[in-house]
Amino acid sequence: YGSHTIRGLKQTHQPSPWINDYGQFSIMPVRGKEKVDENARQSWFSHQSETAKPYYYSVYLADHDVVAEMAPTDRAAVLRFTFPESDESGVVIDAFDRGSQVKVMPDSRTVVGYITRNSGGVPDNFRNWFVIRFDKPFSGFRVFNGKNELKGFEAEGEHALAAVYFTTRRGEQVTARVASSFISEEQALRNLETEVGDADFETVKARAQERWDEVLGRIEVSGGTEEQYRTFYSCLYRSTLFPRKFYEIDAKGNPVHYSPYNGEVLPGYMLSLIHISEPTRPEPIS
Protein backbone atom coordinates (compact mmCIF):
# COMPACT_ATOMS: atom_id res chain seq x y z
CA TYR A 1 0.00 0.00 0.00
CA GLY A 2 2.97 2.27 0.44
CA SER A 3 3.86 2.16 -3.25
CA HIS A 4 3.18 5.22 -5.39
CA THR A 5 3.95 3.83 -8.84
CA ILE A 6 2.00 1.49 -11.11
CA ARG A 7 3.61 -0.52 -13.91
CA GLY A 8 0.51 -2.36 -15.05
CA LEU A 9 -2.99 -3.45 -14.18
CA LYS A 10 -2.55 -7.16 -13.68
CA GLN A 11 -4.83 -10.01 -14.60
CA THR A 12 -4.27 -12.90 -12.25
CA HIS A 13 -5.74 -16.22 -11.22
CA GLN A 14 -3.69 -16.61 -8.07
CA PRO A 15 -4.27 -20.21 -6.84
CA SER A 16 -3.78 -19.48 -3.15
CA PRO A 17 -2.54 -16.75 -0.79
CA TRP A 18 0.85 -18.42 -0.34
CA ILE A 19 1.79 -19.65 -3.83
CA ASN A 20 2.24 -16.18 -5.38
CA ASP A 21 1.01 -15.54 -8.90
CA TYR A 22 0.03 -17.90 -11.66
CA GLY A 23 -0.15 -17.19 -15.39
CA GLN A 24 -0.42 -13.44 -14.91
CA PHE A 25 -0.18 -10.65 -17.47
CA SER A 26 -0.56 -6.88 -17.23
CA ILE A 27 -2.22 -4.11 -19.21
CA MET A 28 -0.95 -0.55 -18.92
CA PRO A 29 -2.29 2.58 -20.63
CA VAL A 30 0.47 4.97 -21.67
CA ARG A 31 1.12 8.21 -23.48
CA GLY A 32 4.26 7.92 -25.57
CA LYS A 33 5.44 5.29 -28.02
CA GLU A 34 8.73 4.68 -26.22
CA LYS A 35 7.09 3.81 -22.89
CA VAL A 36 7.02 0.03 -23.22
CA ASP A 37 9.54 -1.35 -20.72
CA GLU A 38 8.08 -1.59 -17.20
CA ASN A 39 10.38 1.12 -15.87
CA ALA A 40 9.64 3.45 -18.77
CA ARG A 41 5.89 2.95 -18.64
CA GLN A 42 5.41 3.17 -14.87
CA SER A 43 3.38 6.09 -13.56
CA TRP A 44 3.09 7.90 -10.26
CA PHE A 45 -0.31 7.75 -8.56
CA SER A 46 -1.88 8.82 -5.30
CA HIS A 47 -4.31 6.81 -3.20
CA GLN A 48 -6.36 10.01 -3.02
CA SER A 49 -7.09 9.63 -6.75
CA GLU A 50 -7.79 5.90 -6.46
CA THR A 51 -11.06 4.02 -5.87
CA ALA A 52 -10.88 0.34 -4.92
CA LYS A 53 -14.05 -1.71 -4.49
CA PRO A 54 -14.70 -5.44 -5.01
CA TYR A 55 -16.58 -4.67 -8.22
CA TYR A 56 -14.68 -1.62 -9.48
CA TYR A 57 -11.21 -0.11 -9.55
CA SER A 58 -10.18 3.33 -10.76
CA VAL A 59 -6.90 5.22 -10.65
CA TYR A 60 -5.46 8.37 -12.19
CA LEU A 61 -2.05 7.71 -13.75
CA ALA A 62 -0.41 11.10 -13.44
CA ASP A 63 2.58 10.58 -15.74
CA HIS A 64 0.31 9.64 -18.64
CA ASP A 65 -2.69 11.86 -17.73
CA VAL A 66 -4.90 8.77 -18.04
CA VAL A 67 -7.74 7.49 -15.87
CA ALA A 68 -7.82 3.68 -15.82
CA GLU A 69 -10.89 1.75 -14.66
CA MET A 70 -11.69 -1.96 -14.30
CA ALA A 71 -14.87 -3.99 -13.73
CA PRO A 72 -14.70 -7.80 -13.39
CA THR A 73 -16.57 -11.00 -14.17
CA ASP A 74 -15.52 -14.52 -13.13
CA ARG A 75 -13.09 -15.08 -16.00
CA ALA A 76 -13.07 -11.74 -17.78
CA ALA A 77 -13.06 -8.00 -17.24
CA VAL A 78 -13.72 -4.72 -18.98
CA LEU A 79 -11.13 -1.96 -18.75
CA ARG A 80 -11.82 1.65 -19.69
CA PHE A 81 -9.13 4.25 -20.29
CA THR A 82 -9.80 7.99 -20.49
CA PHE A 83 -6.97 9.52 -22.51
CA PRO A 84 -5.69 13.05 -23.10
CA GLU A 85 -5.45 14.54 -26.56
CA SER A 86 -2.54 12.71 -28.15
CA ASP A 87 -1.44 10.83 -31.25
CA GLU A 88 0.68 8.61 -28.97
CA SER A 89 -1.99 7.20 -26.66
CA GLY A 90 -1.46 3.50 -26.20
CA VAL A 91 -1.84 0.31 -24.21
CA VAL A 92 1.05 -2.03 -23.38
CA ILE A 93 0.29 -5.74 -22.93
CA ASP A 94 3.06 -7.46 -20.96
CA ALA A 95 2.99 -11.27 -20.99
CA PHE A 96 6.01 -11.35 -18.66
CA ASP A 97 9.06 -13.57 -18.75
CA ARG A 98 9.71 -17.36 -18.57
CA GLY A 99 8.08 -17.96 -21.94
CA SER A 100 5.20 -16.07 -23.53
CA GLN A 101 3.56 -15.01 -26.78
CA VAL A 102 1.60 -12.03 -28.07
CA LYS A 103 -0.09 -11.59 -31.44
CA VAL A 104 -1.67 -8.37 -32.71
CA MET A 105 -4.66 -8.63 -35.07
CA PRO A 106 -5.40 -5.07 -36.23
CA ASP A 107 -8.41 -5.95 -38.40
CA SER A 108 -10.35 -7.18 -35.38
CA ARG A 109 -8.76 -4.69 -32.91
CA THR A 110 -7.58 -7.69 -30.90
CA VAL A 111 -4.45 -8.91 -29.11
CA VAL A 112 -4.12 -12.58 -28.13
CA GLY A 113 -1.38 -14.59 -26.49
CA TYR A 114 -0.33 -16.84 -23.67
CA ILE A 115 1.75 -16.79 -20.50
CA THR A 116 3.65 -19.62 -18.83
CA ARG A 117 4.89 -17.68 -15.80
CA ASN A 118 4.22 -19.45 -12.50
CA SER A 119 5.72 -20.11 -9.09
CA GLY A 120 6.31 -23.83 -9.53
CA GLY A 121 4.39 -27.07 -9.26
CA VAL A 122 2.64 -26.94 -12.65
CA PRO A 123 2.60 -29.41 -15.59
CA ASP A 124 4.94 -28.80 -18.52
CA ASN A 125 2.06 -27.69 -20.77
CA PHE A 126 0.84 -24.99 -18.37
CA ARG A 127 -0.35 -21.87 -20.19
CA ASN A 128 -2.78 -19.07 -19.47
CA TRP A 129 -4.30 -17.91 -22.76
CA PHE A 130 -5.75 -14.42 -23.11
CA VAL A 131 -7.73 -12.34 -25.57
CA ILE A 132 -8.05 -8.54 -25.45
CA ARG A 133 -10.51 -6.80 -27.76
CA PHE A 134 -10.55 -3.01 -28.11
CA ASP A 135 -13.43 -0.83 -29.31
CA LYS A 136 -11.21 1.56 -31.29
CA PRO A 137 -9.03 0.84 -34.34
CA PHE A 138 -5.27 0.90 -33.84
CA SER A 139 -3.27 3.72 -35.36
CA GLY A 140 -0.17 1.55 -34.96
CA PHE A 141 1.38 -1.27 -32.97
CA ARG A 142 4.72 -2.80 -31.93
CA VAL A 143 5.77 -6.23 -30.65
CA PHE A 144 8.82 -7.13 -28.55
CA ASN A 145 10.75 -10.02 -27.10
CA GLY A 146 12.25 -8.40 -24.04
CA LYS A 147 13.74 -5.10 -25.19
CA ASN A 148 14.17 -6.28 -28.79
CA GLU A 149 11.51 -4.94 -31.16
CA LEU A 150 10.44 -7.47 -33.79
CA LYS A 151 8.94 -7.09 -37.24
CA GLY A 152 5.50 -8.46 -37.97
CA PHE A 153 2.43 -9.06 -35.87
CA GLU A 154 3.71 -11.62 -33.37
CA ALA A 155 6.34 -12.07 -30.68
CA GLU A 156 7.14 -15.38 -29.00
CA GLY A 157 10.05 -15.98 -26.68
CA GLU A 158 11.34 -15.46 -23.18
CA HIS A 159 9.40 -12.21 -22.59
CA ALA A 160 6.75 -11.14 -25.10
CA LEU A 161 5.13 -7.71 -25.10
CA ALA A 162 2.84 -5.78 -27.43
CA ALA A 163 1.91 -2.12 -27.61
CA VAL A 164 -1.08 -0.80 -29.54
CA TYR A 165 -1.64 2.89 -30.24
CA PHE A 166 -4.53 5.27 -30.81
CA THR A 167 -5.05 8.88 -31.77
CA THR A 168 -7.33 10.30 -29.09
CA ARG A 169 -9.19 13.47 -28.29
CA ARG A 170 -9.01 14.86 -24.77
CA GLY A 171 -11.41 12.87 -22.60
CA GLU A 172 -11.89 10.15 -25.20
CA GLN A 173 -12.48 6.72 -23.70
CA VAL A 174 -11.09 3.47 -25.08
CA THR A 175 -12.54 0.20 -23.82
CA ALA A 176 -10.73 -3.14 -23.67
CA ARG A 177 -12.69 -6.37 -23.11
CA VAL A 178 -10.39 -9.02 -21.65
CA ALA A 179 -10.71 -12.73 -20.87
CA SER A 180 -8.41 -15.65 -20.15
CA SER A 181 -8.40 -19.44 -20.08
CA PHE A 182 -6.12 -22.20 -18.86
CA ILE A 183 -7.52 -24.43 -21.64
CA SER A 184 -7.00 -22.66 -24.98
CA GLU A 185 -7.19 -19.41 -26.90
CA GLU A 186 -10.57 -20.52 -28.27
CA GLN A 187 -11.85 -21.05 -24.74
CA ALA A 188 -10.60 -17.60 -23.71
CA LEU A 189 -12.64 -16.12 -26.56
CA ARG A 190 -15.63 -18.19 -25.47
CA ASN A 191 -15.27 -16.89 -21.92
CA LEU A 192 -15.20 -13.34 -23.27
CA GLU A 193 -18.31 -13.82 -25.40
CA THR A 194 -20.18 -15.60 -22.61
CA GLU A 195 -19.34 -13.31 -19.71
CA VAL A 196 -18.99 -9.92 -21.42
CA GLY A 197 -20.11 -10.06 -25.06
CA ASP A 198 -21.06 -6.57 -26.22
CA ALA A 199 -21.87 -5.28 -22.72
CA ASP A 200 -20.46 -1.84 -22.00
CA PHE A 201 -18.37 -0.89 -18.99
CA GLU A 202 -21.20 0.43 -16.85
CA THR A 203 -23.28 -2.70 -17.43
CA VAL A 204 -20.46 -5.03 -16.37
CA LYS A 205 -19.74 -2.82 -13.36
CA ALA A 206 -23.41 -2.89 -12.29
CA ARG A 207 -23.57 -6.68 -12.64
CA ALA A 208 -20.43 -7.08 -10.56
CA GLN A 209 -21.75 -4.72 -7.89
CA GLU A 210 -25.01 -6.68 -7.70
CA ARG A 211 -23.13 -9.95 -7.19
CA TRP A 212 -20.83 -8.55 -4.52
CA ASP A 213 -23.72 -6.85 -2.72
CA GLU A 214 -25.45 -10.22 -2.53
CA VAL A 215 -22.35 -11.96 -1.15
CA LEU A 216 -21.33 -9.32 1.37
CA GLY A 217 -24.95 -8.67 2.33
CA ARG A 218 -25.34 -12.18 3.71
CA ILE A 219 -23.93 -10.92 7.01
CA GLU A 220 -25.30 -7.77 8.61
CA VAL A 221 -23.55 -6.27 11.63
CA SER A 222 -24.54 -3.48 13.98
CA GLY A 223 -23.24 -1.57 16.99
CA GLY A 224 -19.88 -0.58 15.57
CA THR A 225 -18.25 2.52 14.22
CA GLU A 226 -17.93 3.28 10.52
CA GLU A 227 -14.25 2.33 10.68
CA GLN A 228 -15.12 -1.00 12.32
CA TYR A 229 -17.75 -1.70 9.66
CA ARG A 230 -15.19 -0.96 6.97
CA THR A 231 -12.67 -3.30 8.58
CA PHE A 232 -15.24 -6.08 8.99
CA TYR A 233 -16.50 -6.00 5.41
CA SER A 234 -12.99 -5.64 4.02
CA CYS A 235 -12.03 -8.84 5.86
CA LEU A 236 -15.24 -10.54 4.74
CA TYR A 237 -14.40 -9.61 1.14
CA ARG A 238 -10.93 -11.13 1.45
CA SER A 239 -12.32 -14.31 2.99
CA THR A 240 -14.44 -14.89 -0.13
CA LEU A 241 -11.50 -14.79 -2.55
CA PHE A 242 -10.81 -18.47 -1.87
CA PRO A 243 -11.98 -21.03 -2.81
CA ARG A 244 -12.36 -19.83 -6.37
CA LYS A 245 -13.63 -21.29 -9.61
CA PHE A 246 -10.93 -23.09 -11.57
CA TYR A 247 -13.36 -24.50 -14.12
CA GLU A 248 -14.70 -23.07 -17.38
CA ILE A 249 -17.80 -23.67 -19.50
CA ASP A 250 -17.24 -25.32 -22.89
CA ALA A 251 -19.09 -24.87 -26.18
CA LYS A 252 -21.77 -27.37 -25.11
CA GLY A 253 -22.40 -25.60 -21.83
CA ASN A 254 -20.61 -28.21 -19.75
CA PRO A 255 -18.10 -27.49 -16.96
CA VAL A 256 -14.52 -28.48 -17.81
CA HIS A 257 -11.18 -27.67 -16.24
CA TYR A 258 -7.47 -27.77 -16.89
CA SER A 259 -5.95 -30.12 -14.35
CA PRO A 260 -2.92 -28.62 -12.55
CA TYR A 261 -1.94 -32.18 -11.62
CA ASN A 262 -1.63 -33.94 -15.00
CA GLY A 263 -2.08 -31.13 -17.54
CA GLU A 264 -5.20 -32.64 -19.11
CA VAL A 265 -8.53 -30.96 -19.82
CA LEU A 266 -11.06 -32.92 -17.77
CA PRO A 267 -14.85 -32.81 -17.44
CA GLY A 268 -16.46 -31.37 -14.35
CA TYR A 269 -15.94 -28.66 -11.78
CA MET A 270 -12.78 -27.75 -9.94
CA LEU A 271 -12.52 -25.21 -7.12
CA SER A 272 -9.18 -24.36 -5.54
CA LEU A 273 -8.74 -25.01 -1.79
CA ILE A 274 -12.33 -26.22 -1.54
CA HIS A 275 -11.63 -29.13 0.81
CA ILE A 276 -9.72 -26.95 3.26
CA SER A 277 -11.91 -23.87 3.45
CA GLU A 278 -15.37 -25.31 2.65
CA PRO A 279 -15.31 -29.10 3.20
CA THR A 280 -19.12 -29.40 3.27
CA ARG A 281 -19.84 -27.35 0.15
CA PRO A 282 -22.27 -29.39 -2.00
CA GLU A 283 -21.14 -28.24 -5.46
CA PRO A 284 -19.64 -31.21 -7.36
CA ILE A 285 -15.90 -31.15 -7.88
CA SER A 286 -13.42 -33.36 -9.65
List the predicted regions and their residue ranges:
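Single conserved hydrophobic/aromatic residue that forms the stacking wall/gate
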Residues: 274-286
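Accessory carbohydrate-recognition regions in carbohydrate-active enzymes
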Residues: 1-273, 277
